[in-house]
């Protein structure tokens, strides 16, 4: 709450203390997400894809990933998922989640398909003393002569480049998908909860002024 003109420190502290904040946004998001996930999704996919969904990316089960994606789309307007694979076979595939703020740059073709995506990551690596330290790195996904290529660069400008394979073959598209309030796509859409956030803030300020 901003300090009102002429308020002393004591008056300003009392002004803040008497204001009541009721988390309308938090309760609404929790309720809407709960409604969306109460029923199991109908999944039509090959067995290997079903197995992929049962694997836990970064400790997240598929249901948890679904819950997180729904919350993020409501609160910040987007959520990214990378279907990742090292230079191996199908059984090595994993799903990597990315928050909105980690999707820092991208380009798409005329059909809206990504041709370039840059992601920000924080990984915890051993520091040599038995502890771990947070390391910032950037993952760049692009098509090089029509082949999906991944380059990872850390803060020391050390880079590693691979061409992931699925079923032993390189692929000709970038397997990164962004969910937004209107479906799948990289377009920046209006955050669903922004109007309710503004109303919640207005109620909070009115409470401070009138109570």
Language-model region placement:
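Generic low-polarity alpha-helical segments
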Residues: 21-24, 32-33, 148-150, 200, ...
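Extended, Lys/Arg-enriched charged tracts that mediate electrostatic binding to polyanionic substrates
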Residues: 67-162
